[in-house]
């Protein structure tokens, strides 16, 4: 359910495989309202309908820019965008215009990033790296992006140099929900010390 906030200056959307999140934004970058919706749709018409189901309260009388990252730019998404090869800056100089049937929407997609060796790709995570670099533009090192498919990205001189994906989150979910370990894992409590140790090991040997 979207918060009611008419007249957002623009809308940001992160479209994942299992759902999407949307933010009503001011011209100065302030988050005015947030919403989330279900995914599992294909084609521009279905994506537009899904977005309108949560973002309609934010639309004014004119055209509202909508900037979308993630799976909406993949095959079967709103529109397929070309890949950008590494090394490259997290964000392209230009977004990709997407078809929109509602006259209140002006939709643009952020292209994803690919790597040939080893073969890998990201759609959506590049925007998080861009956000991190906006706060620390001189950063040189490895950025970890936890999630269903965790990504580790080597960043240097404002560019993504290389990256690698691990199915950490998905494997953990499968073990907890569907494996023979389910009864014992369900009873486990969070262990902050073990977490800190794991983070320390990862930082020392990225």
Where are these regions (language model features)?
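Short glycine-aspartate micro-motif
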Residues: 10-14, 65-67, 141-145
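A short acidic Gly-Thr/Ser loop motif
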Residues: 13-19, 71, 145-149, 168
């Amino acid at each position: 359910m979207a918060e009611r906030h008419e007249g957002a200056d623009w809308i940001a959307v992160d479209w994942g495989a299992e759902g999407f999140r949307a933010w009503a934004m001011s011209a100065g970058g302030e988050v005015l309202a947030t919403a989330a919706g279900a995914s599992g749709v294909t084609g521009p018409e279905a994506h537009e309908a899904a977005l309108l189901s949560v973002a309609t309260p934010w639309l004014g009388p004119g055209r509202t820019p909508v900037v979308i990252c993630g799976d909406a730019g993949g095959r079967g998404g709103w529109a397929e965008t070309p890949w950008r090869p590494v090394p490259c800056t997290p964000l392209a100089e230009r977004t990709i215009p997407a078809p929109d049937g509602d006259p209140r929407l002006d939709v643009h997609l952020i292209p994803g990033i690919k790597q040939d060796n080893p073969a890998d790709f990201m759609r959506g995570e590049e925007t998080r790296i861009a956000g991190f670099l906006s706060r620390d533009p001189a950063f040189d090192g490895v950025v970890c992006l936890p999630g269903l498919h965790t990504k580790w990205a080597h960043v240097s001189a404002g560019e993504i140099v290389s990256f690698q994906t691990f199915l950490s989150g998905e494997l953990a979910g499968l073990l907890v929900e569907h494996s023979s370990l389910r009864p014992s894992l369900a009873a486990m409590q969070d262990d902050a010390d073990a977490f800190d140790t794991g983070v320390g090991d990862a930082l020392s040997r990225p």
